Amino acid sequence: MDNMLTLDQVTELRSILNQRLAFIAGPNLSSDLCSDFVIIATADDFLGVQGDVHQGHLEGFSELYSSIETCKVEKEDLEEARKHGNQYFFKKGEIISRIFLVRDRVQGFVDGKEAWTYNSDIGIVLKLESGHVAITRLGYHDEMLKVTYLDELSVENLPATTGRFEVDVHSNYSLTRSLISV
């Protein structure tokens, strides 16, 4: 099963390249920097990043799987974030020089043989002049997003993503995480 951003969403992400970061915000983005909706504000534009859940089917099993999506930012969302003090100005004024997708590949094995593969975009990373801002899903099955500021970018520095993939005497799974430049 594949659960990745669409070409249109990747194009929306590219629209903030080479712009100056103004702030990160969200109507419910409290000081722990977790929410299902995050606003990336630049000097020229606003881009929303939203976590959502959808029914998916993997190897005949129906389950809720989360996704990360880009979306429009409504004036009301910005006003709510401002009203509640949920705007964060760390790294303000720095240019967004690159954008990466964070893609996970989860492979399930039964009796040592590959049984299924789940590919999912679990986040985005903005490369700035003095570090990075990552917006990643916290789980494969819930919509919560986490904003993380990083000095150095590596897959090991990103928050772990939790899942409900079971391990027993016959089955296990492996995870491969990669960064893909857009």
Question: What is each model feature region?
Answer:
Residues M1-V182:
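Surface-exposed, interaction-prone regions used to assemble/regulate multi-protein complexes
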